[in-house]
Amino acid sequence: MDIKKIIGQIVFIILITSGISFASTYELEINAGHSAIEGRFDKVMTVKQGILTTGIGAIYNDDGYKIANVKLTLGNGASLPELRLNLGFKGVLGNIEKGNKDGDLTAIGFLFLGKYSIPETISPIPIDVSVGFSYAPDSLCFSDSDRYLDFRASLDFHIVKNATIILGYRYIKVRFDDNRGQWEMSDDALFVGYQLKF
């Protein structure tokens, strides 16, 4: 068995189990676009160093891919109270199909998350502008995958205290290097979602 594949699966399992032990605020999100649906479950905990977030998620696209992910980030309030930044890691595991090609995705990527709350003087409805970027170079990709990148941006409308409507954009790009040579899959989509906090 390929050593990179074994190491990738071990790291992925460690990241998943590390997120299970933390608890504080929970966030459950479901969003859907034209051909994809995504679900997320995050746990947010205040620790001595800042805000620790762990989470699991999955994206299913009927055009040919299934991707599960796990994240671990640490952040704190920046110098502005409206701005929150998080840095961490994101593990991804999935299967991609494109035409007659089929590849397995396993990667550990660097993750950046940012959220800016628009002041109430500008908007009467509480709105957050959220962005997320994850990148895994060749050295952190396993199985058939050679490079992984995803980007997400959204407007989060807080309609009630614990519920948010999300309007967003998502972009995913994966490069493979397997016995059929190098090939890529990319997908972008607008989506609408709903998030509950409890």
Could you tell me what each predicted segment is?
Residues 27-30, 42-46, 73-81, 85-100:
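Outer-membrane beta-barrel proteins and related beta-barrel translocases across Gram-negative bacteria
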Residues 51-53, 65-69, 82-86, 105-109, ...:
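Short connector loops at helix/strand junctions that flank enzyme active sites
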Residues 78-82, 91-198:
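Outer-membrane beta-barrel transmembrane domain signature
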Residues 2-3, 7, 74, 96, ...:
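Generic N-terminal leader/processing signal
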